[in-house]
Amino acid sequence: MATVAAAARGAGARAAAGLRSCGGAVARERPRSGCARRLCSAPAAPAAVDMKSYLWARYHEAKRSTDELVPSIMNNLLNPDAIFSNNEMSLSDIEIYGFDYDYTLVFYSKHLHTLIFNAARDLLINEHRYPVEIRKYEYDPSFAIRGLHYDVQRAVLMKIDAFHYIQMGTVYRGLSVVPDEEVIDMYEGSHVPLEQMSDFYGKSSHGNTMKQFMDIFSLPEMTLLSCVNEHFLKNNIDYEPVHLYKDVKDSIRDVHIKGIMYRAIEADIEKYICYADQTRAVLAKLAAHGKKMFLITNSPSSFVDKGMRYIVGKDWRDLFDVVIVQAEKPNFFNDKRRPFRKVNEKGVLLWDKIHKLQKGQIYKQGNLYEFLKLTGWRGSKVLYFGDHIYSDLADLTLKHGWRTGAIIPELRSELRIMNTEQYIQTMTWLQTLTGLLEQMQVHRDAESQLVLQEWKKERKEMREMTKSFFNAQFGSLFRTDQNPTYFLRRLSRFADIYMASLSCLLNYDVHHTFYPRRTPLQHELPAWSDSPSAFKAPLLQEAQAK
C-alpha cells in the first residue's frame, strides 16, 4: 500500500522539484530567499515558444520518467501476509493475547453472507409485511464495502473520507448512483457536518442521522437496505426511510438473536468455517511460548464451543486462561455493574458469585473492570485482536492502554490488486500528472488552459479507473480519490497493528518489533521517506534549452 504511494509521490515531488525555477532557470538546489517567495512558480518558457508544444513536451517527458520507474516498483511489492504498524510495538512486551471470535479466530466462507441476506429478507416479508416481490433480490457480494455511511433520513449509502467529505460517484440510492449535482444540493456541498455523522460507535443515535457500517456482518445489511430501497423506488411506493432502516436493522439482528445463523452454521460447519488450520497453528505457537490467552466474544457458548472444537479440537479450552461469551461488547468495556456468570458443561447458567476466573471454564457477560480486577492483566502487556474497530478496539486503546490488533480480511485482496503492474502504472502516472498540473497551473493563457483541461480530464478518468480496480461502486476500503477513508482514519487511531488474518502472526517470531513506516508529511521532503532507493525518480529535465 505504502510502496506505490511513496514511489508515486516521490516521482511527483521530484518532477515538481525539477520543474521549479527562478527567472527561467531550473531550481535544482535550495532556492534563495528571494526566489523562495515565489511558491507557485513554474519554468518560464522562452517568449517564442509555442505553449501548447512546450506543455506537451513536459507531459511526454514525465510519462517517460514514469514508465522507467515502474519496473523498480515491481521489484519491491508488498507482502499480502505482512503485518502493518500504526504504532511501534514489540511482541517481547506482550505477555497476554486476547481474541474476539467471529472473523478473528474463525473465518467464514462466502456462503454466510448469502445466508444472512436471505434470512433477513424473508423476515422482512414474513414478520414486517414487506412486499413478497423483494424475494427476487439476491445477495451480491460485489456491491458494498465496509466503512460506508448510510444517511437514515435520506436513504442513501455513501463513502466518506477522513475529513468528512463525500466521495462523489459513491453515493447510492437503492442500487443506482446519485448524480453529483443532486448530492451537492442535498448536502449543500460535499461536506458532512460533525453533528450529522454517526456517534462514537458508528451508530445513528442522539441526533446523529448517519450509521457507519464497520463490521463484516454489515455487508449483507447494506445490500439488503439498498435492494429494498430499489424496489420501492422502481415501483413508486411511498415509504418512510427511517422505518425501512429500522426494519432492516431489526431483521438482521433477529438472524443473530433468534439463532438462525448459529443453527445453520452448526448444522453444516464445514460449509461455513474456513482456515481452521491457520488459527490452530497460531494458538499452538503462542501456547508453546508460554503466552496467556483469553477469548471475549458476543457469540453464545454452544456456538463458540462447536466452532472451536472444529478448529482446535475438543480440548480447546485448555489453551485459554479465560473464556467469556455473550459479552455484549462494547458495553462490556464500559459497564461496571454486570457480574460474570459461570456456564456449566450443559450450558446452564449458575448463580455462584465469581471470585476467580478459572481456566477451562466458560463465563457469560461480566465487564472489563471486574475482568481486570480478577486477572490483573493491565496495560501494554496485553494485546487484543478483533475485526470491529469500534466494538473490539476503541475503548481498549483509549481507556485501558491495551495494545490492539485489527483483523482486516479485505487487506489481502487489496494488496494483491495493488501489486499488479496495471495498478502500479496507473497510480504512478496519476501522481506524476497531478504534480504537473500543480506546477503548470501558473500558465493562464488560453492555449495553456486548454492543455491543462485535457490533463484534468485524463486525471479524472484515471481516478475513476483506480476506484474500479477494487469495487465498481465504492472503490477501496482504505482510500477515496485522494484522501484516506473515514474507516482508515479510525483504524489508524484505534489499532496499533493490522493484518489480513491472525495467520500473519506465523511470519514473525514472538520477539519481533513492529515499526510504523515513516512517510513524509505534506510539508516534509519526500527524501525523508524510508522508501527503498529504487523509488527515487530522476529529476525531470528542462523540456526546452535556452
Swiss-Prot record:
Claim: Hydrolase is one of the keywords in the record: yes
Binding site for Mg(2+): 100, 102, 387
Keyword presence, Metal-binding: yes
InterPro entries linked: HAD-like_sf (IPR036412), HAD-SF_hydro_IG_5-nucl (IPR008380), HAD_sf (IPR023214), Pur_nucleotidase (IPR016695)
Annotated GO CC locations: cytosol; mitochondrion; receptor complex
Residues the entry annotates as binding substrate: 249-257
Keyword vocabulary terms for this entry: Hydrolase, Magnesium, Metal-binding
Catalytic residue positions: 100 (nucleophile), 102 (proton donor)
Enzyme Commission numbers on file: 3.1.3.-
MF GO annotations: hydrolase activity; metal ion binding
Top-level taxon: Eukaryota
Cofactor note: Binds 1 Mg(2+) ion per subunit.
Broadest EC class assigned to this enzyme: hydrolase
Cofactor(s) in the UniProt record: Mg(2+)
Protein family membership: Belongs to the 5'(3')-deoxyribonucleotidase family.
PANTHER family associated with the record: 5'-NUCLEOTIDASE DOMAIN-CONTAINING, 5'-NUCLEOTIDASE DOMAIN-CONTAINING PROTEIN 3
Protein name per its UniProtKB record: 5'-nucleotidase domain-containing protein 3
Organism: Mus musculus (Mouse)
Annotated gene: Nt5dc3
